[in-house]
Amino acid sequence: AVLIMSAEKAAELGMKPRAKFHSFALAGTDPVTMLKGPIPATKKILEKTGLSIDDIDVFEVNEAFASVVLAWQKETGADMSKVNVNGGAIALGHPLGASGTKLMATLLNELERTGGKYGLQVMCEGGGMANATIIERLD
């Protein structure tokens, strides 16, 4: 599960935040080549934040087909040892309406396990659109 609230509300409830949202981006491609959406979404969020692909410690790239991740990696140059390290949607499933939550939980758990700082989640959302989110693990 993912629980989202302000830092103020977390303090009020005596809860310790595990991560914060660093940035969001949305991008689209020609619907005919819709499986390429994560590529411009990733480029857009990195440009927006000033981070480089090498600044990201863990990637969760949702895929319905293996070619999505391979095309994404070829274009971004991401280190594949940091991509879907616990298995992607092909191995673990692609839950309808819950992919984002699954990816976010996996991403944060892996950042905590490895001591990483930044995690990037990127996924297609249909019709050529894709979204990207960078989270920052808090100590």
Each language-model region and where it sits:
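Active-site pocket-shaping loop/turn-to-helix segments
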Residues: 1, 22-48, 92-102, 106, ...
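Conserved beta-strand-centric core segments of catalytic alpha/beta enzyme folds
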Residues: 1-3, 100-139
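Channel- or pocket-lining gating/hinge segments that regulate access to a cavity or pore
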Residues: 1-18
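Acidic, glycine-rich active-site loops and adjacent beta-strand->loop/helix elements
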Residues: 9, 22-29, 62-67, 88-91, ...
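Beta-strand segments within the central parallel beta-sheet cores of soluble alpha/beta enzyme folds
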Residues: 15-26, 54-63, 82-88, 117-124
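Short glycine/threonine-rich loop-to-helix capping motif typified by GTGT followed
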Residues: 31-38, 63-81, 95-99, 131-138
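Conserved catalytic cysteine-centered active-site region
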Residues: 75-102, 107, 112-117
